[in-house]
Design a protein with these regions (language model features):
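Residues forming the flavin
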Residues: 1-19, 24-195
Length: 195
């Protein structure tokens, strides 16, 4: 989101996601009957700020290099410093246990690919594997990213463009409402799962 659409400072979202922007107290302007415009930097900053104040921890310069797989369930992530991985240094990673893991890695859907490849399991898709995103269709992509947001394997949830890639739905255009709605949906799914 920080980079907007092709690095423009303004981003667009549709009416269906406006309630999320209001919840985060982000400034916006009406563009037409269904589209709204907001500042990309303010929007991203507000989301990060509110997430941290709600209890989220953001790890700086970390990369997830694997998942923890116990009893046929994704149970956490294996992390290392990004510069260590980039330089190819042999440094043992750390494990972070988690009740739920979200693959929000975008088009690459790295966590889902890793889980399927390394553990011989079937994801909750038509093929049992990462299908791969289809070519761009703005309207369908915005709807399908939300539909594809789900628990894709026990303990592993998928959202955003990773959901599109895993489920084989079209990539989205420069509209951000579907991404926000996908994030809200995965948060609600996990809240329900942890009750």
């Amino acid at each position: 989101m920080w980079g907007g659409a092709m690095m423009f400072n303004q981003i667009v979202l549709q009416q269906e996601a406006l309630h999320i922007i209001k919840e985060f107290d982000i400034n916006y302007e009406k563009y037409n009957d269904n589209l709204y415009v907001m500042d990309s930097v303010e929007s991203t900053s507000a989301l990060l700020y509110k997430a941290v104040h709600a209890g989220a921890t953001i790890f700086n310069c970390y990369s997830v290099e694997d998942v923890i797989f116990k009893n046929n369930k994704v149970s956490g992530v294996v992390v290392n410093w990004t510069p260590v991985l980039r330089e190819g240094m042999h440094v043992d990673p750390l494990n972070i246990m988690a009740k739920c893991v979200i693959d929000g890695t975008g088009h690459d859907s790295e966590m889902c690919r890793t889980v399927a490849r390394k553990n011989g399991i079937r994801l909750a898709t038509d093929t049992g594997d990462v299908i791969g995103e289809r070519s761009l269709d703005v309207v369908s992509g915005e709807e399908e990213v939300v539909n594809g947001t789900k628990e894709i394997y026990p303990g592993l949830y998928v959202c955003g463009m990773a959901a599109s890639a895993v489920s084989g739905t079209p990539r989205m255009g420069p509209i951000f409402g579907g991404m926000l709605l996908s994030g809200k949906k995965v948060a609600d799914l996990i809240i329900d799962a942890l009750k």
